[in-house]
Amino acid sequence: MTTTSRSGRQLWLPWLILVVSLTLITYSVDSFIRLPQQLGVSQQCRMSRMWPAYIDHTSNLEPFSPSGLWRKYRLYLYRERHFEPMDLPTGSPALFVPGNSGSYGQVRSVASSASRQFYKENGSGARRDEWKDAPPGVAHTDWYTIDFNEDFSAFSGTTLIEQATFINEVVSYLSDRYASAATHSYAAGERNTTVPILAHSMGGIAARLTAHLPNYPVGNIDTIVTLSTPHAFPPVPFDSSVEYVYSLINTPLDASRVTSRSARNVPPLLVSIAGGLLDTQLPSDPSSLSLARIGEAIAPSRISTYTGSLPSLWSSVDHVAVMWCDQLREKIARGFLLDMMAFGRVSDERNAGGVSGRSSVLRRRRELWRRALSLFDVSDAGNGEIGPLELTPSPDWLLEEDRETFVVENESPSFQRPTSGPDSALSVDQQNTVFRIPARMGDSDDGLHAFELITNLCVGWNPSSGMGAPLPQPVELVVQLCTSNPDSSDPVSGQRTSCRLVMPWQWELIPPSFLPRTDILMQESSQHIDTHLPENRPFPSADEIYHVPGYAFQRLRLDADLLQRQRIDWIRVERKTDSGVFVHQRGLKSFVRGGWMRQAAGRLKKHGSSLLLTQDQDSDIQHHYQDAGFATTSAIPIASEWLLKGFSSSLLARRIELVPSQCLVENLALYTLQSNDESLHSTDASFSPFMRVSDRATGDSRWYPQLASPELVRRIRARTYKGEPITFPLSLHGNAPFMPPARDSLNEIRVQLWTDQALLRPVPGKSLPCRSSVDSIRLSVDWKASAGLVLLRYRFLLAAWPLGLLSVCIGLSWLTWTQKPELPFPSPLTSITQPVFRTPFIGNRVDPLLGLLACTAIALILLDGMRLWLYRCMSSAEARGPTSSLIGMVLGLHNHASSAGLIPCFLLVSYATLLVIVAIIQWSFSLIAAIVTRFGLAHKLDWVGAATASSDPLKWNRRSMAGLAILLLSVVLLVPHQFVFLIMFLLQLLNTLRALLELQSNRGPPQSQESRFHQHLSILMMLVLLLPQKASFLVTWVRNLASVGIKTPNTMAAWMDHNLLDVAPIVVLVWLMAGGRMLEPARSKMEAKAIVFGFSIVGWYALVWGIRYTYRTYDAFNALCLVLAVCHWRSRRAGSRSHYSQGHAACNVAKHSDETSGMLHAHGKDEGVNLGDAPAEEFELRSGLASARLPIHHLALPSSVDPQSGGASIAEGNASTCAVVESSAQTNLGGDKLDELIADYLDVLDRYQRARNATSALFSSGYLKLTRAKIELGASRLSSNSYDSRLLAEVRATISNESSSQSSCGGLPAQASEISHISVARVQPDYSHLENDDYVLIQDMDESKVEKADSTIAGLRRRAAVGVTLSETDVVEGSGPHKHSPRGSLNDSVLRPVRVSAADAEGRGDAIKMSAVQPEKGHSKNSKYDVISTNQGDDQLGRMEQTKKVAAKPDALLQFGGLPSTALRGAQVDLRKALNQLLGAESHVHDDGVLQLALRLEVLTSAISTLKATAANQSECEKR
């Protein structure tokens, strides 16, 4: 990647992307908000009622809680007033675990329902009739609930581990309190008591985690029911500790546990119920155990479904309502009651028999919970307890007899019936019908038939149904499954018939699909509809109690494998009454419809993204035997079925367009259905067609009853119906992002359509095909609703991808700046709007921003395709389930076409989000800086201390290092690393503001200060995008701090958030930047590549893994901070010597602080030397030659000194001495001249090294004594920022030109001929002009007491030196302690170095004085500067001496104390000597100073390089 031409950029492109992205975001957000209306879903939950009371048991936990968590959390026992007789425990324990920010009081809905189903409502403790035979103290559940202080467990794995640890301690306490009873073989309490758990949201994760902790009570937790729990992956992937928890609980089970029959190896029964589409707080996809492949090796250990599939509810439920929804709480409460009633509470008995076979109690407990939840067919996700067919031992395994599921042995009664006579099983009359197994019509038809029976009659009392207390009801319909076997008593021709009764729990409750009654239909109009009529009520409705007998329909389905396994020969249906009791009370007509159907017999045809479903031409060829009275005489099946393979998706919403057949339309126009019709008319229409669409992998389903609605029938009879399709929305949970793809045997959508055969009778006078109630069903994609579903699943996109794009753009800018450090480092806004990127194969013909986004999108799409290929090829990846890293890459989809369409859209939205964030923050800093400056607060935010030059050896400030060590040590001992990250964020915020204020104050080289500000701002931008990951945890930590203090509980997670490495690199980098300097360029290609690689790693993790593993972006940024800190440290340690970039060693990158900025300018870059080819020693010397990098103490000149543009200073320009190299500039460039120059160079180099070492020793001694003086006087009286601005200059520079004719040195830079010679001497300043003041020189003043803006400090009045002409532009604001005085009264005078050319110096004289000037105009009453001659000043001073008393001369030490200490005076002496030796002041030989020697080395180096270049050119010419 190289720098592209700025002229080819389209500056409007970022804003165009912003407009397009805002359109996409608006479209998606609008779809998300209107998602329930678009999908036709609404929450239909009845409100639950209860009388709660809580009894605190926390004090009893202390002996069972060695971790000390009993001080942090609490345990309560729930009691329902007016039902439960006493507050003491009376039954079996059950525990409720709240979720993220959940309350312990959420248990009241389920616990209240359990009490109301078990006790009568009088408070006497009397049981209901169905529980009167239950063992005492077993069946009833004592509900305990845990108070987790409403912790945010979704954001912290540490919190989850602490909660799981406390759950284990509570279970140990409850097992001890509810000790098992004594038996003949065991003493009391010898066997473990099980404690089933009900958990909401993240509480389910904590409950599952208990088995992986050291204090887990083995065998005491055998049932975990979870509500809206994200089992597959974390809902908020901001913390690596949460991912660690998920990796523990989702580890596949060992093969030994699958085959073991030991009770200790039996996993807990895990029941997962998800809320569905209305749960927008947490997507319900990860709640599917089947789709996540959790526990699929032991299918009987799991149940997974959605609330929309639960009978009597059939509604999606939001995240909170899943706890109080009345229809759901009745099922859950009854499931716990039945579980304890049937299997007791002793752990060994409940887990006996292993995990498979008829003896497995686990299978029986699963069957009980399936019945309690009323799960049938595809609603029991993952193929029920069978599991995926890919994992079955063999195809014949399904037909084995031990596959029969039951709760109690012989629960389905069987009896013998004669084969002839009136009581024969084959006898048929008007109320009794026999359905024989259809004959095989071909080899392909084997096993394709299934039996369907639908009725609204009562089929018996079902106590195992989880729909509240069962209502007494008569048996109005009986179904028997009969088998004919040879009779042993009559071996010749005798047959014996054995029939098994179909029990009530085998019937599935389905929604009612009423056909409009014609007598009522004729009385109503479209404007006046009676909503109280059953056929006019919406579905589902919270006001309807569907499980009341006679309202909803009952369905019996007998699949082919069940009929084969039980060897059924025929099915006998006996109707006990003509009209049902409950049906008649509602004014409805009783009906029974049954018949055979072929499974998955429909035809599919794909049209682009749409799918067309039609009937198979041969699907109506069915064999019905003796079905008179129940079914029509035609051979039309009662149901049609389509299987859509690979059609499952959670991201796509669809529209169903159903076209009714003409036969159905004609029959709807002619049928007759009367109210309260008690007669038996088997051929009359009885119910409206209805449909169900379900996903076999997840168990999610959607019912569409009453396809022939009253409005449609009304239009048909009015002849206004024109054949328009009936439209319904559809969205199911299926294959989802970051989830394993569904198994092939489960990856299907099933569409089922039921039709009353009476509505498909031949129409008199018309020849119409009457094979089906619909001509076609079209499924098409609803793109608007799909946008809302995509937004629901990819909400964390904005937490990762903007950071990735920012990192890539800043990395490109950093690489370019490293190559060309003479350019300022670009701002973040410039980096993202004008990225330095060259599009491969196209170059500058495409805008760099467009090329960058396009290349990123193509790379991600190709990477996603490679990921899919690897996942399908690696069996180990599929075995890992949701923990596979391949699933979490990019978008985590298993459809490459979907990824290719979404990735460009996501990139545009991410870029627009980044653009808005960066622009707002960058503009906000400008606004804040303006406000701070306006109110005069800038000086309070000034840098503390002085940042030394880049060429200085890296020195360590003890106080700063101590603070850094304490901060890092606090991470280990006291606070989590997230808290320190927040501190570093705030510190970097302050650093960035300081850098901007200094940039606006114009106190230093603008290029370096601009680079520093942009670097600080770039790092801050990345910290801003990372802040949400850590701020979420801090909320939990602060809450815990308020509740239990700083003490950490004794758990395995005690030190998870106290890892020093999680924050140390960020702390070090921000600490380095807090010193007031910018980060140095790379010294070598290796370092440059390392920095670019660090930014690339952040971009890689953010774009590739950022959505699923967001926390990895923080780890990548940590590594980037480490690389930046190490490279900066190496550059500082070596004086920022870079042989990677050519010719920029002496650029303006030296001083970056208020204290030293502007003191000396850089030499300027060398134009003729290739440093990359120079020896290391020569390069090291040249890197240190820039006088701007010489170690000059910050007290040598005031911090406000800022060189003027256009002037000359001691430290600026390439000074040269023509006399030294005069001979080297001649035309004759022989080898003797070159040897002579090299010898001279080595001699000067030796003198330079000795002079510099001596200067360093003096500086070290002076600083040591200054430190001792600080200890003696105190930091408040002697600080690093102190400087008496009233002092005059004590340094005089003499610039002379020996000969203008000799000033032209061949090959030397142009500026070298301007200054012939520089000599520096220290002089005694003349303070006589101060003797006219009325005040003493040194006077303590309180700035807050100064009342007038025109008063000056201590009455001083400054005059300029002789011959110096000043203008208003020569004056700058003072710096130091009095900068930005609030009242403008204390303004420091500043020293101005004046740059004078050789010609000017010769005309004015041989001496130029650097002196002080008065403050800016407007800050003093003497707004005009007095420029006088020396004689005038002497006259004036003479007059002063006659009238005024001579004041004390100013001294640098008097500002620190009235009587300076010996250490302070010693420091002054040493530092003054060091400065003299550095500048060559008071030296008899003008060339002995470090400055002069460095300049001579510079000239000699340039001359030698020029001679080499000239010799090389002459050699080439001679060769030619």
From Swiss-Prot:
The keyword Transmembrane applies. Belongs to the GPI inositol-deacylase family. It is found in: Endoplasmic reticulum membrane. Its main location: endoplasmic reticulum. Its EC number is 3.1.-.-. This is GPI inositol-deacylase. GO terms for biological process: GPI anchor biosynthetic process; protein transport. GO terms for molecular function: phosphatidylinositol deacylase activity. The keyword Membrane applies. It holds the Pfam family PGAP1_2nd. The active site is at S201. Glycans are attached at N122, N192, N1214, N1253, N1297, N1387, N1513. The chain crosses the membrane at residues 13-33, 796-816, 846-866, 886-908, 915-937, 966-986, 1018-1038, 1052-1072, 1087-1107. It comes from the Eukaryota. Keywords: Endoplasmic reticulum, Glycoprotein, Hydrolase, Membrane, Protein transport, Transmembrane, Transmembrane helix, Transport. SUPFAM superfamilies: alpha/beta-Hydrolases (SSF53474). GO terms for cellular component: endoplasmic reticulum; endoplasmic reticulum membrane. It is an enzyme of class 3 (hydrolase). Involved in inositol deacylation of GPI-anchored proteins which plays important roles in the quality control and ER-associated degradation of GPI-anchored proteins. It is a multi-pass membrane protein.
